[in-house]
């Protein structure tokens, strides 16, 4: 009878141990559980929490119903170790998935930064090209500096007039070849600088009796010397007329 009772107790203890061990939702190969993504890993972690609560309730019932509590405690310790390993495994999976997503976001941000850097370089190149074009336009002497409607049509005429005035200011000495006869009266026309530049004039005399008509002398002529020359010749003419009048008076008295 005692042997039969011992056998019944052994079978009951094995059944309770199997129930306690069967309550565990995972074994030591729980690290092989994979998740498709970060959301799947979080979902498995939540399911693991509910499974741990269910296993704790089963172990408590088995511990209260059986007389071999030491065996239930040992099986519960083993289950707790497996549960801790599974939880750590799930946490590692969640962290790896999270790190993977963060890495993808970092790669995206890095590519965006590279694109922005390339755009900035292109912009600097365009600005440099624009500055070079501006320098070439500034260096072009034939380029139009103002708008056409702000330019008058008399611009070219004013430039020519300014050039002519600058030429008039620079009066040159002109050489004249003319016969010089003492006592002759010289007459000059009003001078024109543009017509006299680079030309020679011969001064005609009214007295043709002198034998020195072929003698020629070159002298330089200036506009301001005209009244001086006229005054000298008038003095000589008056002196000659005075001599002639004196001779005539002497003949009359004789």
UniProtKB/Swiss-Prot annotation:
The protein's assembly and partners: Binds SCAR.
Keywords associated with the record: Cytoplasm, Cytoskeleton
S-S pairs: none
Function: Involved in regulation of actin and microtubule organization. Part of a WAVE complex that activates the Arp2/3 complex.
Region listing for Disordered, in residue ranges: 1-26
Keyword Cytoplasm: yes
Name this polypeptide is given: Probable protein ABIL5
One GO CC term, this protein: cytoplasm
Compartments, as annotated in UniProt: Cytoplasm, Cytoskeleton
Family: Belongs to the ABI family.
Top-level taxonomic group: Eukaryota
């Amino acid at each position: 009878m005692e042997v039969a009772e011992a056998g019944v107790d052994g079978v009951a203890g094995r059944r309770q141990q199997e129930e306690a061990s069967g309550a565990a939702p995972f074994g030591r190969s729980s690290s092989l559980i994979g998740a498709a993504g970060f959301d799947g890993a979080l979902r498995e972690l939540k399911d693991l929490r509910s499974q741990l609560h269910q296993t704790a309730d089963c172990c408590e019932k088995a511990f209260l119903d059986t007389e071999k509590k030491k065996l239930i405690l040992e099986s519960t310790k083993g289950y707790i170790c497996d549960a801790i390993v599974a939880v750590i495994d799930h946490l590692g999976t969640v962290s790896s998935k999270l790190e993977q997503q963060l890495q993808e976001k970092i790669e995206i941000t890095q590519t965006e930064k590279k694109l922005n850097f390339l755009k900035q370089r292109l912009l600097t190149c365009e600005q440099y090209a624009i500055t070079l074009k501006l320098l070439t336009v500034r260096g072009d002497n034939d380029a139009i500096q103002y708008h056409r409607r702000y330019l008058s049509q008399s611009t070219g005429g004013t430039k020519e007039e300014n050039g002519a005035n600058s030429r008039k200011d620079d009066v040159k000495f002109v050489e004249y070849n003319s016969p010089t006869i003492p006592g002759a009266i010289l007459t000059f026309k009003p001078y024109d600088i543009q017509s006299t530049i680079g030309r020679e004039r011969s001064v005609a005399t009214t007295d043709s009796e002198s034998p020195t008509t072929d003698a020629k002398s070159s002298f330089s002529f200036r506009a301001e010397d005209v009244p001086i020359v006229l005054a000298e010749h008038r003095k000589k003419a008056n002196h000659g007329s005075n001599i002639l009048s004196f001779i005539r008076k002497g003949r009359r008295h004789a």
